[in-house]
């Protein structure tokens, strides 16, 4: 912060928001899903679906007539979250930037499915044994993140049911390979 800056109001959201509010004497706390909805509505007033993929969890918020209709969270597995991608990149001595760079230029992403971390790791090892490139595995992992979100969290069979105004949130979408995978799997083909 600039030296003369003054904090006039503060807010907190996420896991343990009430505890943090009390401990740090924060002015306001908000339930995370409501914060997601409020932010999405600010940027896309006609939002129909919100997909949040963070480092540790995923959320899908379905909206109907401008109100939250349903909220779905990932279960115990974190295979579709940012921390899993980061761990995978580090295991190959890759930075996230290099992971993305390799994934984006892949010509044949490996189909890793959308299973939990333990199964995903074994599929990755199998793909390595079969001679797939780091880029193809990275691209496959990016696709698996989105497949996991669509199939296991959102439980969507037809992506057109997401509506026309989808807002994506969460740090995992800063990964261009994941964002491109999301676009390929959810936008209608012409």
Give short role names for the model-derived ranges.
Residues 183-189:
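Conserved small/polar residues in nucleotide/adenosyl-binding loops
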Residues 122-152:
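Adenine-nucleotide phosphate-binding core of ATP-dependent small-molecule kinases
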Residues 65-108:
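Glycine-rich phosphate-binding loop plus the immediately following alpha-helix
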Residues 17-54, 59-66, 70, 154-157:
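Conserved phosphate-binding catalytic cores of ATP/NTP-utilizing and phosphoryl-transfer enzymes
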Residues 153-160, 167, 172:
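Generic long, charged, amphipathic alpha-helical segments
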Residues 1-32, 164:
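N-terminal glycine/serine-rich phosphate-binding loop of ATP-dependent small-molecule kinases
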Residues 4-5, 44-47, 161-163:
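Short helix-loop-beta connector
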């Amino acid at each position: 912060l600039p030296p003369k800056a003054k904090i006039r109001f503060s807010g907190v959201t996420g896991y343990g928001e009430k505890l943090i509010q009390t401990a740090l004497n924060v002015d306001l706390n908000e339930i995370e899903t409501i914060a997601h909805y409020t932010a999405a509505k600010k940027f896309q007033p006609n939002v129909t679906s919100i997909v949040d993929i963070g480092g540790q969890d995923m959320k899908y918020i379905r909206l109907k007539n401008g109100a939250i209709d349903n909220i779905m969270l990932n279960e115990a597995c974190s295979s579709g979250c940012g921390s899993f991608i980061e761990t995978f990149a580090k295991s190959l001595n890759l930075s996230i930037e290099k992971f993305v760079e390799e994934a984006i230029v892949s010509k044949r992403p490996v189909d890793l499915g959308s299973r939990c971390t333990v199964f995903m790791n074994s599929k990755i090892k199998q793909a390595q044994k079969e001679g797939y490139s780091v880029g193809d595995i990275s691209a496959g992992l990016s696709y698996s993140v989105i497949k996991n979100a669509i199939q296991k969290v959102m439980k969507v069979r037809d992506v057109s049911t997401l509506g026309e105004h989808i807002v994506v949130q969460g740090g995992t979408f800063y990964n261009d390979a994941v964002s491109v995978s999301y676009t390929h799997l959810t936008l209608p083909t012409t």
